[in-house]
Amino acid sequence: MIKLGIVMDPIANINIKKDSSFAMLLEAQRRGYELHYMEMADLYLINGEARARTRTLSVEQNYDKWYEFTGEQDLPLADLDVILMRKDPPFDTEFIYATYILERAEEKGTLIVNKPQSLRDCNEKLFTAWFSDLTPETLVTRNKAQLKAFWEKHSDIILKPLDGMGGASIFRVKEGDPNLGVIAETLTEHGTRYCMAQNYLPAIKDGDKRVLVVDGEPVPYCLARIPQGGETRGNLAAGGRGEPRPLTESDWKIARQIGPTLKEKGLIFVGLDIIGDRLTEINVTSPTCIREIEAEFPVSITGMLMDAIEARLQQQ
């Protein structure tokens, strides 16, 4: 029997209608896996050994009672076959410390989804630089004068921090906007932090598409997140409306071009953000949108994921 651990935010507070981690647990349970639940505070290192307090649990699609803890133990993480790292951003130093603990278990043979080193290496905004032929024009800088020159060249740009999620602190600066200076100062904290500028993509009106990639294989359907009421952000957390759709030809092309790199880096479950035919982000920490897509189309994304995990475990 496969022992699957999950590190996540408190399960008591999730919305099971749209929580991807919960969907993964349901599928793992359906396959007869033993489920071990952990929060960040449960992980620890003792003399170089990664351990955790884990709680075995059962889950069910029930809005009143969706989980039950069935036992508690303290064990070496190496006792688990696979661990899903599903802690939501912020990607801060605490998150990084947790990846080091998980890496100690990985060295003992536990499969970590996603690979701890790659979680550290692949910033969700900056990792797109390795695929610059697929992205909008992109500038990463702390320098206000460079941001101003980029804005003057494109006259309509998006500015964002490198560590935001859910659309937080994303600004659109149009031609003639008097606020560029203060936005640049705010995002760079007066030239002490990097931020990202990209040319505005009018295709955002048709949605910011979340394309999921499972061990290098694109899921054939995506979730387009469509901005509402004059917003420029499609993020569901910013009030965007989700619309599941089949992938377009350009979606396939982008996902297939990036897929082999993701697989090679041990990034087994990844969410690409695509606007029109341009790649804007590569989400590796805790991608979501499984439930919205599965509700609309005949696809089991969690099934694809567990198949990929089982295939990797057999190769070990």
Swiss-Prot record:
Gene Ontology CC terms: cytoplasm
EC number(s) on file: 6.3.2.3
InterPro entries per the UniProt record, alphabetical: ATP-grasp, ATP_grasp_subdomain_1, Glut_synth_pro, GSHS_ATP-bd, GSHS_N, PreATP-grasp_dom_sf
GO molecular function, one term: metal ion binding
Binding site for Mg(2+): 281, 283
Manner of cofactor binding, per the entry note: Binds 1 magnesium or manganese ion per subunit.
Cofactor(s), names only, from the UniProt record: Mg(2+); Mn(2+)
Highest taxon of the lineage: Bacteria
Glycosylation sites: 256
PROSITE patterns found in the cross-reference section: ATP_GRASP
Transmembrane domains' residue ranges: none
The protein, known as: Glutathione synthetase
Organism: Escherichia coli O127:H6 (strain E2348/69 / EPEC)
